[in-house]
Amino acid sequence: MKIGFFSPENIPIVYHLRKLIEKLTGHRFQNGCGMTEGLLARSEEFLTENVSHISLKGNATPDRVLAKARELVVRRGCRIFVFDPLNRFDHEPAPGQTETQYISNLLNKFTEFATQYNCLLILVAHPRKMNRNPTTGATPRVEMYDINGSADFYNKADYGIVVERDKEIGITRVYVDKVKFKHLAWAAWQLSSTTRQRAVSPLRRISRPCRPAGATCPEHRL
């Protein structure tokens, strides 16, 4: 499945490609981490064939980005798009339009694009500032309703995933906050920055699939 990125924070693109190669292979570029010339060459060939980037001169408005995405659908056959992050778009709300109204219309526009071209559109958005509990000092877990700007980020999404990095203990947690068709899956990933090991745990159950008595439920993974 071919993918297109609009990711201004990963410019120059060569740096983004480096990140993608490390994720694709599971090996870092440092000496002794297993990255070989052959593995690098195969990875570069795969990315050249399957990954495209949207780069624009001037204002990167949602309409301009979507126009480039349409070109990638037609010319390259892209069916997955990642817009990362939302706050790097050049937004142009109409006069008198509130932030909530603007975001609602914008999400409708993204949804219509994904539906029309049968694409998966992944939108990365940042939460509002989360205040620590004055008594415990703990920061509450971010949920989709905490995304800065509008509750429609939860209401209008088909799927919602929250990535939480706990730098104090070196753990990254991935919560599935919403699945529109709840029979599909539930899961929560936890990744240790020290051991690089993943663990699946029911940190947030999305659904309990119906199954015959005595049947086992296979593990669902992201």
Model-derived features with residue positions:
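Cytosolic-facing regulatory segments adjacent to core modules
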Residues: 1-77, 188-190
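Structural recognition of the conserved hydrophobic beta-strand(s) that form the central parallel beta-sheet
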Residues: 5, 82-83, 119-126
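Cofactor-binding loop segments of dinucleotide-utilizing enzymes, especially the Rossmann-like FAD-
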Residues: 8, 126, 165
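Flexible loop/turn segments at secondary-structure boundaries
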Residues: 11-16, 23, 88-92, 129-132, ...
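Amphipathic alpha-helical segments in well-structured domains
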Residues: 13, 103-107, 146-150
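Conserved, well-folded catalytic cores of nucleic-acid-processing
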Residues: 23-27, 85-92, 113-116, 124, ...
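Phosphate-binding/switch loop-helix module in NTP-utilizing enzymes
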Residues: 52-116
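C-terminal regions of RecA-like/P-loop NTPase motor modules
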Residues: 63-78, 112-117, 129-222
